[in-house]
């Protein structure tokens, strides 16, 4: 249910950016106040990403006020901060559906609105995309603007600097807005810097600077260089932009990101300039809601809550898989001082908070730098250290070349704890872990395991840790069936060996990972065999052969793309071994699955208990003759 717009009279007058641009500028601060309040109370009812959006209210207003969107292109990085943008671009009444099945996406999505110029979800892509748009406009002789809005976290990734290096070299007409919510500005330096930014971004200074450059070009090179260095030195005393200037960008800032009047003035000036330029905006995550300002991590992504009371206390229940990993990590680190853990900016999400507190000297958060994280692990492994890299399935895609070239090719003992495997839920297709079995299974030297419950996850993590080669354990988001952890047991399991969980007749279900549990429930009803395969590479070929010899049909079940996944490996083995038994595959379809709850999405793709029973019953009914 959406918040009533009747309580927000000024916001009600702004259904879209075109209406926004008709407002007098002096009304923008009041509009920002209403927009922030509307956002807070909407997300409190629906759940979603909160702190980032609260911190980007004034910036979003100023960008849409100054630029002629959607003709001018705004490209948001990651997209957590896009909720104010969605409210202002005709989707206000549907905000209550955000991240819900069939509702608005939690990130910018091209199919959803012409104002969403580029689909995002992963970090640090905005500058590359906006640069492409800027170069396309230049090639077509069009005057539209391209603006990338990127956070200080997104700036830690190499792709951002690769794009800036290219933009500077190409002299592209590109504005990058750096939304810095980690930096604080001291009062005096901040005031001086903002005053200087207004001067430097103004038309008078821009015209003077362009004219002086033309004059300096006619002077001897030493004089030209002296003038350039003098300007850099004077700006550098109050402006921290030397790095960006070296990449070919004009730097402006820092500017108070919550002063909408100043933002409109500076952005208005920059809109009339050309070439690569960067505006450094300083904001506060969670701005305007004290609990979110004090704990932006807790309020990054929230469920439903009462803004007057704050977030509800978490209730007990089964451990989430990331908590299982966190406990295992601490237990193994206590036993083995060689263990070193790595995360690419996902300490909380990967369950590593306690480990980081207890073992800070053996913990590396490398920032949003998945490529570096993988090769860092490879370098550690070369020196007899035992690296454990905790990484989401969807983000491991970003370090794939390093996994192949730097880890697997050298057969280095790196343990990949692959979190968020399968359908993750509300974050949708940018974050589903749909492909890891497919892209890992084809890599020589890789061992891949998929646990069916918490206890098996614990045992397989230990197995991978003790293995002398690259090893991936993939597990889902959220809780498992509630299996007790074997916390005193850190010994390995036999690699490449599954276990038959139930003996039935006619159909043998070869289940991988979390789908073992619903497969067992269906097998009880239909009297089928179920094997918990545990390993995707190497497969338990002896078990597959035995089941092929004693059943009329084999069915593989996995929460991964069917194409190239575990089931494909089973079919390859059957063909290689000359085993003439029919086989069917159940897994994720050949399309990007949208957002919703995991239960809704599993039902959509036929991998919930009801869907499995439908498929298995249908195949059972078509089998000819008696069982073997």
Swiss-Prot record:
Annotated EC: 2.2.1.7
EC main group: transferase
Domain of life: Bacteria
Reactions that this protein is recorded to catalyse: D-glyceraldehyde 3-phosphate + pyruvate + H(+) = 1-deoxy-D-xylulose 5-phosphate + CO2
GO BP terms: 1-deoxy-D-xylulose 5-phosphate biosynthetic process; isopentenyl diphosphate biosynthetic process, methylerythritol 4-phosphate pathway; terpenoid biosynthetic process; thiamine biosynthetic process
InterPro entries named among the record's database cross-references: Dxylulose-5-P_synthase, THDP-binding, Transketo_C/PFOR_II, Transketolase-like_Pyr-bd, Transketolase_BS, Transketolase_C, Transketolase_CS
Cofactor note: Binds 1 Mg(2+) ion per subunit.
Cofactor(s) essential for the protein: Mg(2+); thiamine diphosphate
Cross-referenced SMART domains: Transket_pyr
Keywords: Isoprene biosynthesis, Magnesium, Metal-binding, Thiamine biosynthesis, Thiamine pyrophosphate, Transferase
Entry's Gene Ontology cellular component terms: cytosol
Pathways per UniProt: Metabolic intermediate biosynthesis; 1-deoxy-D-xylulose 5-phosphate biosynthesis; 1-deoxy-D-xylulose 5-phosphate from D-glyceraldehyde 3-phosphate and pyruvate: step 1/1
Residues annotated as binding thiamine diphosphate: 80, 121-123, 153-154, 181, 289, 370
Subunit text: Homodimer.
PANTHER family per record: 1-D-DEOXYXYLULOSE 5-PHOSPHATE SYNTHASE-RELATED, 1-DEOXY-D-XYLULOSE-5-PHOSPHATE SYNTHASE, CHLOROPLASTIC
Homology family: Belongs to the transketolase family. DXPS subfamily.
Function: Catalyzes the acyloin condensation reaction between C atoms 2 and 3 of pyruvate and glyceraldehyde 3-phosphate to yield 1-deoxy-D-xylulose-5-phosphate (DXP).
HAMAP family: DXP_synth
Name of the molecule in the record: 1-deoxy-D-xylulose-5-phosphate synthase
Organism: Alkalilimnicola ehrlichii (strain ATCC BAA-1101 / DSM 17681 / MLHE-1)
């Amino acid at each position: 249910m959406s918040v009533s717009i009747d309580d927000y009279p000024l916001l009600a007058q702004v259904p879209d950016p075109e209406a926004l641009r008709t407002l007098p500028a002096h009304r923008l601060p009041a509009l920002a106040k209403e927009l922030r309040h509307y956002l807070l109370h909407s997300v409190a009812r629906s759940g979603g990403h909160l702190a980032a959006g609260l911190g980007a209210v004034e910036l979003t207003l100023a960008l849409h006020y100054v630029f002629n969107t959607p003709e001018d292109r705004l490209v948001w990085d990651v997209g957590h901060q896009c909720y104010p943008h969605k409210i202002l671009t005709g989707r206000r009444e549907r905000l209550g559906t955000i991240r819900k099945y069939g509702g608005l996406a939690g990130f910018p999505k091209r199919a959803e609105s012409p104002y969403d110029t580029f689909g995002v979800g992963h970090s640090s892509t905005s500058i590359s995309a906006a640069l492409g748009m800027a170069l396309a406009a230049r090639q077509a002789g069009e005057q539209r603007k391209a603006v990338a809005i990127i956070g200080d976290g997104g700036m830690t990734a190499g792709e951002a600097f690769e794009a800036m290096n290219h933009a500077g070299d190409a002299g592209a007409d590109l504005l990058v807005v750096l939304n810095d919510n980690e930096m604080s500005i001291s009062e005096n330096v901040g005031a001086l810097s903002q005053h200087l930014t207004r001067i430097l971004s103004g038309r008078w200074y821009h015209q003077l600077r362009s004219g002086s450059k033309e004059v300096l070009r006619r002077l001897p090179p030493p004089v030209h260089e002296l003038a350039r260095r003098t300007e850099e030195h004077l700006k550098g005393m109050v402006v921290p932009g030397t790095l960006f200037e070296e990449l070919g960008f004009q730097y402006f800032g820092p500017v108070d990101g919550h002063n909408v009047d100043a933002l409109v003035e500076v952005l208005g000036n920059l809109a009339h300039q050309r070439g690569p330029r960067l505006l450094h905006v300083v904001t506060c995550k969670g701005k305007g809601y004290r609990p979110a300002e004090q704990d932006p991590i807790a309020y990054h992504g929230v469920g439903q809550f009462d803004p007057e009371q704050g977030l509800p206390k978490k209730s007990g229940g089964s451990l989430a898989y990331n908590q299982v990993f966190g406990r295992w990590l601490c237990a193994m680190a206590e036993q083995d001082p060689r263990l070193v853990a790595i995360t690419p900016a996902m300490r909380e999400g990967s369950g590593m908070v306690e480990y980081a507190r207890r073992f800070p000297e053996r913990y590396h958060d490398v920032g949003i730098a998945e490529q570096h994280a993988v090769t860092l692990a490879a370098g550690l492994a070369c020196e007899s250290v035992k690296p454990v890299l905790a990484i989401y399935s969807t983000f491991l895609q970003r370090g794939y070349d390093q996994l192949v070239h730097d880890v697997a090719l050298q057969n280095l003992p790196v343990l990949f704890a692959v979190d968020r495997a399968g359908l993750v839920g509300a974050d949708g297709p940018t974050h589903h872990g749909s492909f890891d079995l497919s892209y890992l299974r084809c890599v020589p030297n890789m061992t891949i395991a998929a646990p069916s419950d918490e206890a098996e996850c614990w045992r397989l993590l230990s197995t991978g840790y003790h293995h002398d080669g690259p090893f991936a354990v993939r597990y889902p988001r959220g809780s498992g069936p509630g299996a007790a952890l074997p916390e005193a047991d850190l010994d390995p399991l036999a690699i490449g060996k599954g276990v038959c969980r139930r003996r039935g007749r006619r159909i043998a279900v070869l289940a991988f990972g979390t789908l073992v549990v619903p497969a067992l429930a269906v097998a009880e009803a239909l009297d089928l065999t179920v094997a918990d395969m545990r390993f995707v590479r190497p497969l338990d070929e002896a078990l597959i052969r035995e089941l092929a010899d004693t059943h009329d049909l084999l069915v593989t079940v996995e929460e991964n793309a069917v194409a190239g996944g575990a089931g494909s490996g089973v079919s390859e083995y059957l063909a290689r071994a000359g085993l003439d038994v029919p086989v069917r595959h159940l897994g994720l379809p050949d399309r990007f699955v949208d957002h919703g709850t995991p239960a809704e999405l599993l039902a959509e793709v036929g991998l919930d208990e009801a869907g499995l029973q439908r498929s298995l019953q249908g195949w059972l009914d078509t089998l000819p003759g008696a069982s073997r």
